[in-house]
Amino acid sequence: MSTPSAPANPKVGFVSLGCPKALVDSERILTQLRMEGYDVVSTYQDADVVVVNTCGFIDSAKAESLEVIGEAIKENGKVIVTGCMGVEEGNIRDVHPSVLAVTGPQQYEQVVNAVHEVVPPKQDHNPLIDLVPPQGIKLTPRHYAYLKISEGCNHSCSFCIIPSMRGKLVSRPVGDVLDEAQRLVKSGVKELLVISQDTSAYGVDVKYRTGFWNGAPVKTRMTELCEALSTLGVWVRLHYVYPYPHVDELIPLMAAGKILPYLDIPFQHASPKVLKAMKRPAFEDKTLARIKNWREICPELIIRSTFIVGFPGETEEDFQYLLNWLTEAQLDRVGCFQYSPVEGAPANDLDLEVVPDEVKQDRWERFMAHQQEISSARLQQRIGKEIEVLIDEVDENGAVGRCFFDAPEIDGNVFIDGAGDLKPGDKVWCRVTDADEYDLWAETL
């Protein structure tokens, strides 16, 4: 007599949109579902239910989220929505009334419960038999991972609605962060990308209280966290660093090789008038002097930043001020966005002249051309120098990787001719042979 086959595990499809912080949220939800016996599938057709983790930061991101929700409904029919756009449930249901549930960001339990209601977990599921790794389910390649250290933000930048979506700053216990980092490294991660809405504010909400890791006291504070992370023997890269005065403390750690000499600081603009309208504190800051001082302490320092052009009230004089500032600052990696009104943002109520779309486009093009010249000149200086490269991809044409001044997805690449025995996750020393405004070409030593 044949033994009846066990019922199949329930299957979940998942779409993750938006920033690395949202990606970490997706990883947490998927880890919980996997521990409960759900299989994660890669097609709409194979899924019993689809979860869409949305982005709601700007209008174009909302449009993409609504488009993906519609695609999931068309291809599957059973869709649960979560993430930053989830705070606008009415707007989502106006366009897609058939979605089964809508939750906001960080509402992990509500998402999992919504999945339970659509397709319950198997009653006889034994979580001990699931091969969920200690570091959880990761959506990044095996050799790098995002390490989220806090949620929310205490700032009130006039163009931003993150505090209304994700709340005020809540720092994770320092011991938990370091335990997670250690698990990731043990699993094969070679690069930790430290993220949050405001990385340098870590611990402010708990008054930098002392926690414990491996039996030793560690302050819940950015500098001490970086010191501890540096003992793990992997690349540590800092993102979303607000330019607080205590950021100066991180530069000696970079100069000493404890963490990567890479700072991702979203300056947003340079004109004091525009920064004041944005409610950014840097309008009181001698930012150029600080950058000069940082580079004196750590000559290899790479600075990445993002800027907004076309903010309400921005004049041609303000824009020229920004271009001149870029010339002096000599930033290495730069992104630029045209200002887009965000529903609920205080900037919508500013009594300032709106910059026409065609002017925004013109300024964006001029900004990008100006910065490309700067970036290209800085990368040309790398030709002939030796760099350590972390390999991301290998194919028949060679290998593609990154060095210390390249974060994944947002920065450039290092192209290596001929892969040899290289594989993703390997580190290899190379000599730079060529460069353009974004990328390097190199040969192995």
Swiss-Prot record:
GO process annotations (BP): tRNA modification
NCBIfam families reported for this sequence: 30S ribosomal protein S12 methylthiotransferase RimO, MiaB/RimO family radical SAM methylthiotransferase
Cofactors named for this entry: [4Fe-4S] cluster
Cellular compartments annotated: Cytoplasm
Taxonomic classification: Bacteria, Pseudomonadati, Pseudomonadota, Gammaproteobacteria, Pseudomonadales
Keyword vocabulary terms for this entry: 4Fe-4S, Cytoplasm, Iron, Iron-sulfur, Metal-binding, S-adenosyl-L-methionine, Transferase
Top-level taxon: Bacteria
Protein name stated in the entry: Ribosomal protein uS12 methylthiotransferase RimO
Residues binding [4Fe-4S] cluster 2, per UniProt: C153, C157, C160
Pfam families, alphabetized: Radical_SAM, TRAM_2, UPF0004
